[in-house]
């Protein structure tokens, strides 16, 4: 990291283990930007926030980025993407609900609402968010996770419980037919294409 830091003004690192970012930062003389780790995915959360602002703020073209009170329902694993999205929702004054099977939720933090019922999570939500059920490095847990997440798919019955104006997001790549149906991936409410 020291050698690289001598040649650049910043380092954007996509790593598997978050500890590697921490280790890099101890020897770097330039900023280290987390592009993805097993702990968080802040760049994805920023991109998603911009999509939500573009869709729901009164007039982003003149600098009014207010999305206060909007609700994001994340249906899936309490993982790096969920953690980062919850953090940016808190900063922007949005509500965040996580629907995960027992044992896959994020720790309670007093901000987010956690449920084990996807229908409860999406009720009236402005944004429905899906992510892969089997993250990078978890391939050995695929069968177990797919079984645990049965019933946590973004599909038409779930979308029908959200607000009429709701959009669907996914950090991609998506396993269509698993965590999200083709119908919802390509629907008019999808902000994926």
Could you describe each region identified by the protein language model?
Residues 1, 21, 85-86, 118, ...:
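Generic hydrophobic/aromatic pocket-lining and core-packing "Φ" positions
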Residues 54-130:
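Glycine-rich phosphate/diphosphate-binding loop of Rossmann-like nucleotide-binding domains
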Residues 109-182:
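Rossmann-like adenosine-cofactor binding region
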Residues 7, 27-28, 92, 110, ...:
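Short, structured coil segments at secondary-structure junctions
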């Amino acid at each position: 990291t020291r050698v690289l830091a001598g040649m650049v003004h910043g380092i954007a690192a996509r790593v598997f283990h978050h500890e590697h970012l921490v280790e890099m930062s101890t020897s770097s003389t330039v900023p280290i930007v987390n592009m993805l780790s097993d702990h968080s995915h802040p760049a994805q959360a920023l991109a998603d926030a911009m999509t939500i602002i573009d869709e729901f703020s009164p007039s982003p073209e003149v600098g009014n980025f207010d999305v206060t009170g909007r609700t994001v329902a994340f249906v899936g694993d309490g993982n790096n993407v969920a953690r980062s999205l919850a953090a940016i929702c808190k900063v922007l004054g949005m509500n965040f609900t996580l629907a995960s099977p027992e044992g896959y939720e994020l720790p309670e933090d007093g901000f987010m609402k956690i449920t084990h019922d996807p229908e409860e999570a999406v009720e009236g939500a402005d944004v429905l968010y899906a992510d892969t059920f089997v993250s990078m490095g978890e391939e050995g847990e695929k069968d177990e996770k797919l079984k645990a997440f049965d019933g946590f798919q973004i599909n038409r019955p779930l979308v029908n419980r959200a607000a009429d104006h709701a959009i669907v997001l996914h950090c991609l790549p998506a396993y269509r037919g698993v965590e999200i149906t083709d119908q919802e991936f390509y629907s008019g409410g999808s902000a994926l294409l």
